[in-house]
């Protein structure tokens, strides 16, 4: 079953509801195995998709109607980040969303459902006004179900795109579990695994799922996918195969998570095909490049600092380090979905505000502020206010 009746409901791989409000009344049924749209039907317009998350918007901007991957090892914040994106985008974005839980924890699926009910993305009183359809094939399901649940979610999204001609958001958590399920099925079929024990058909399976997630002239599908990175190794076949299909990659770093900088997005590892001056504009591009250059220089100097100490650096390098430490902290921001844990209200920072903030740090306009003032704030005005508060406390 596809269509408006699936909104606000949780379905399994077969499209059967697994929540309480009874059967899904839908006259339209689509098969989950469908071919990708023809090349001539694809839409090639390039525009930026604002998320309200500073580090993503500035350094690896997302493409409207593109595919975005959130890469990270265990426990660095992929699910929190994808939940925050669902929260920011599903609320601000007028269209509908489809969220596919592929082989992840049932608890996370339940948390997401409860959160959506609280934020009224799922309207319990009038279920037809909900903005999201949930499709779950979690860890406890057999491998066949986990392998196919991504296709079920794609099919639901395709209905909204092709029949209703809407802009759709498709969230998938987690692509690696789809690959693992394929590997289990492959072993059961007696296929010989190549290196690392993945299935020999890995590229084909990934392609058949990813090629369907695209934007046509009828409507767009913007897809955000969490990708678990086994043992923090980005060259593992599963994340490596996935990244070939993506427009933007947001890489989460264990080092930043250990420093307490959340979202722990690595500014030097994250990439985007949209980071071009003719797409994002000169101002945005120059600022992003400046930020990356400063952080790269800081990274090069870290060995010298570790061995000889800060005092051995030249005046210019010391200034670079001071600014880089501010730039490293400024991308951290409080999340709406983490309010219950942190106690600080979430922040949505618009792209112009983000650019303005980094433009003030780079040339040294904010050299007088302590680096703690840039930690877990929204825009640059909040950092200035926090610095003033810290000064009062110090006195």
Curated annotation (Swiss-Prot):
Its EC number is 7.1.2.2. InterPro entries: AAA+_ATPase, ATP-synt_VA_C, ATP_synth_F1_bsu, ATPase_a/bsu_AS, ATPase_alpha/beta_chains, ATPase_F1/V1/A1_a/bsu_nucl-bd, ATPase_F1/V1_b/a_C, P-loop_NTPase. It is found in: Plastid, Chloroplast thylakoid membrane. One of its GO terms (cellular component) is proton-transporting ATP synthase complex. One of its GO terms (molecular function) is ATP binding. The keyword Lyase does not apply. It comes from the Eukaryota. Pfam families: ATP-synt_ab, ATP-synt_VA_C. One of its GO terms (biological process) is proton motive force-driven mitochondrial ATP synthesis. It is a peripheral membrane protein. ATP binds at residues 72-79. SMART domains: AAA. It catalyses: ATP + H2O + 4 H(+)(in) = ADP + phosphate + 5 H(+)(out). The keyword NAD does not apply. It is an enzyme of class 7 (translocase). Keywords: ATP synthesis, ATP-binding, CF(1), Chloroplast, Hydrogen ion transport, Ion transport, Membrane, Nucleotide-binding, Plastid, Thylakoid, Translocase, Transport. F-type ATPases have 2 components, CF(1) - the catalytic core - and CF(0) - the membrane proton channel. CF(1) has five subunits: alpha(3), beta(3), gamma(1), delta(1), epsilon(1). CF(0) has four main subunits: a(1), b(1), b'(1) and c(9-12). Produces ATP from ADP in the presence of a proton gradient across the membrane. The catalytic sites are hosted primarily by the beta subunits. Belongs to the ATPase alpha/beta chains family. This is ATP synthase subunit beta, chloroplastic. The lineage of its organism: Eukaryota, Viridiplantae, Streptophyta, Embryophyta, Tracheophyta. The gene is atpB.
């Amino acid at each position: 079953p596809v269509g408006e009746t699936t909104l606000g409901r949780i379905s399994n791989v077969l499209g059967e509801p697994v929540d309480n409000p009874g059967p899904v009344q839908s006259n339209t049924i689509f098969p989950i195995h469908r071919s990708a749209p023809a090349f001539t039907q694809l839409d090639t317009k390039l525009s930026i998709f604002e998320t309200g998350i500073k580090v993503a918007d500035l350094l690896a901007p997302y493409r409207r109607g593109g595919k975005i991957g959130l890469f990270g090892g265990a426990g660095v914040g992929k699910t929190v980040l994808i939940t925050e994106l669902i929260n920011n985008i599903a609320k601000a974005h007028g269209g509908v969303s489809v969220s596919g839980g592929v082989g992840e924890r049932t608890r996370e699926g339940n948390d997401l459902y409860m959160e959506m009910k609280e934020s009224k993305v799922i309207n319990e009183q009038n279920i037809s006004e909900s903005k999201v359809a949930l499709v779950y094939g979690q860890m406890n399901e057999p491998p066949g179900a986990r392998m196919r649940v991504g296709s079920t979610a794609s099919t639901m999204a395709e209905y909204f795109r092709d029949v209703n001609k809407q802009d759709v958001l498709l969230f998938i958590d987690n692509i690696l579990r789809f690959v693992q399920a394929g590997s289990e099925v492959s072993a059961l079929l007696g296929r010989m695994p190549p290196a690392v024990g993945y299935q020999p058909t890995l590229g084909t399976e990934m392609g058949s799922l990813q090629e369907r997630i695209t934007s046509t002239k009828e409507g767009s599908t913007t897809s955000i996918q969490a990708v678990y990175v086994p043992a923090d190794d980005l060259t593992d076949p599963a994340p490596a195969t996935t990244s070939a299909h993506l427009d933007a990659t947001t890489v989460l770093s264990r080092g930043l998570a250990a420093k307490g900088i959340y979202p722990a997005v690595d500014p030097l590892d994250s990439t985007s095909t949209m980071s071009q001056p003719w797409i994002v504009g000169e101002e945005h591009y120059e600022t992003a490049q400046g930020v990356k250059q400063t952080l790269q220089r800081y990274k090069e100097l870290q060995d010298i600092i570790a061995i000889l100490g800060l005092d051995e650096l030249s005046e210019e390098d010391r200034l670079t380090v001071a600014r880089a430490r501010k730039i490293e902290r400024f991308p951290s921001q409080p999340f709406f979905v983490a309010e219950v844990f942190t106690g600080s209200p979430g922040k949505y920072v618009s792209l112009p505000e983000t650019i303005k903030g980094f433009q003030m740090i780079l040339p040294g306009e904010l050299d007088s502020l302590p680096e703690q003032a840039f930690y877990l704030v929204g825009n640059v005005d909040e950092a200035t206010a926090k610095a003033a508060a810290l000064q009062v406390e110090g006195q």
